[in-house]
From Swiss-Prot:
Disulfide bonds: none annotated. GO terms for cellular component: nucleus. This is Pituitary-specific positive transcription factor 1. Belongs to the POU transcription factor family. Class-1 subfamily. The 9aaTAD motif is a transactivation domain present in a large number of yeast and animal transcription factors. One of its GO terms (molecular function) is DNA-binding transcription factor activity, RNA polymerase II-specific. It comes from Bos taurus (Bovine).
Length: 291
């Protein structure tokens, strides 16, 4: 037999602390067949399948009662909730939502662990901090050695990576005034730039060194060698290639040195003759004017 809702002829007396010991509970005639009276809530749950309404699990942790059982009382509630009132109450919650999912619990623990790591302050004596300080000092020294200013570095990086790089950024990095996260990001960029700048500097130094090697050192000729060359110049001011080679071997000089000496000597002789001619012309002109 199924349970039926109360009619107008069915009455019951509410229980309270004063009348619970004297007044009997008037129950529906067929109530005993629907729900046996039990002193434990688990018996009510086991017989709840015969009721007209579902008995959802209570999601409040501090309550052990269910719909159909009076909270804090051992007397069962035998009336039926109307459907429209049940629809406005708390909807039944699925069991997976009520129970703690192990995967979700692990995820929450991992999230709390990561957030804790983010919030923890950086240890100033950590190896990462020491390495960052060492790189900042080395970067400044190597930048100055290469001849670049902070503005040069900022403009070079801004042309490649964007306008967020400037002289102020490089200055704050060298003075360790950036956050640890931003300093680590900038360290990788500056390390790459420094490597490229040193490669360019090495190529430039190699080119300059090659040009310097082309210029030979000035040769010093001894007084005895100069006297011998002067005698040869008095005899022949334009010696041939064979004569230059012979003189170079005799004086233990390079052939090119002897050749250049004769060229310079002829130029000096020419300047002396020109100067003498001008002086003679000036003297002659003055002498004629005096007459």
């Amino acid at each position: 037999m199924s349970c039926q809702p109360f009619t107008s002829t069915d009455t019951f007396i509410p229980l309270n602390s004063e009348s619970s010991a004297t007044l009997p509970l008037i129950m529906h005639p067929s109530a005993a067949e629907c729900l046996p009276v039990s002193n434990h809530a688990t018996n009510v749950m086991s017989t709840a399948t015969g009721l007209h309404y579902s008995v959802p699990f209570c999601h409040y942790g501090n309550q052990s009662s269910t719909y159909g059982v009076m909270a804090g009382s051992l007397t069962p509630c035998l009336y039926k909730f109307p459907d429209h009132t049940l629809s406005h109450g708390f909807p039944p919650m699925h069991q997976p939502l009520l129970s703690e999912d192990p995967t979700a619990a692990d995820f929450k623990q991992e999230l709390r662990r990561k957030s804790k790591l983010v919030e923890e302050p950086i240890d100033m004596d950590s190896p990462e901090i020491r390495e960052l300080e060492k790189f900042a000092n080395e970067f400044k020294v190597r930048r100055i050695k290469l001849g670049y200013t902070q503005t040069n570095v900022g403009e070079a990086l801004a042309a490649v990576h964007g306008s967020e790089f400037s002289q102020t950024t490089i200055c704050r990095f060298e003075n360790l005034q950036l956050s640890f996260k931003n300093a680590c990001k900038l360290k990788a960029i500056l390390s790459k730039w420094l490597e490229e700048a040193e490669q360019v500097g090495a190529l430039y130094n190699e080119k300059v060194g090659a040009n310097e090697r082309k210029r030979k050192r000035r040769t010093t000729i001894s007084i005895a060698a100069k006297d011998a060359l002067e005698r040869h110049f008095g005899e022949q001011n334009k010696p041939s290639s064979q004569e230059i080679l012979r003189m170079a071997e005799e004086l233990n000089l390079e052939k090119e040195v002897v050749r250049v000496w004769f060229c310079n000597r002829r130029q000096r002789e020419k300047r002396v003759k020109t100067s003498l001619n001008q002086s003679l012309f000036t003297i002659s002109k003055e002498h004629l004017e005096c007459r």
